[in-house]
Amino acid sequence: VTITVDANQAQSTTNWQPGVHWDYARALQTARELEALAVVWLEEPLPRYASEDIARLNDAVSIPTAGGENNVGLHEITRKVRENVYDVPEPESMVKAGITTLRKIGTLAQAFWKKCVPQQGGGDIGGGAHLHLVASWSNAPFMELLNDPPIGDYRHKFSIFANPPEVSEGMMSVLTSPGQGVEINPDMIESDS
């Protein structure tokens, strides 16, 4: 079983979850505890613009740090990769100016010998596009797909597809229809109009 931990400290520049704000000392202590548990990585241990502290954390621990889903544009992720702020960039095409920019981020990460694990792409069509990118990258071991049933079941995000992807034993097949592989369910369009 692969376990990753998301501290969710990069969502905004303010404390959006009262009582859950991490400082450097808390991030360091937690990272050391997670190392002992063989957790694969610690995602977003500090606010997204605390680059110096995240890089310092990377130097102090062996557990990789991941993040970047809320950083905007290629320029922000380029800086994070160059300065070793995140070991595993986790771009999100809905924030990063689309699939073309996401593709560039994956190539950049590969050039720096880093894994790249995109976020879920907002589900629906973005999720299908992310799935194709992950399948084409040798440095993408998997793609993050939110699944929090019953309300946040990943299948809800793909309900507009005539051919929704299914997760089976932790794997999801790439959609095979032309383009991004997505076929929109015409009944969904008619029911929403």
Predicted segments, located by residue:
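Metal-dependent enolase-superfamily TIM-barrel catalytic cores that perform enediolate-based chemistry
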Residues: 1-55, 60-61
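Short acidic, gly/pro-rich beta-turn/loop elements at beta-sheet edges
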Residues: 15, 101, 184
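Shared catalytic-loop signature of beta/alpha-barrel
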Residues: 38, 47-67, 71-171, 175
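Extended hydrophobic packing segments that form well-structured cores
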Residues: 178-193
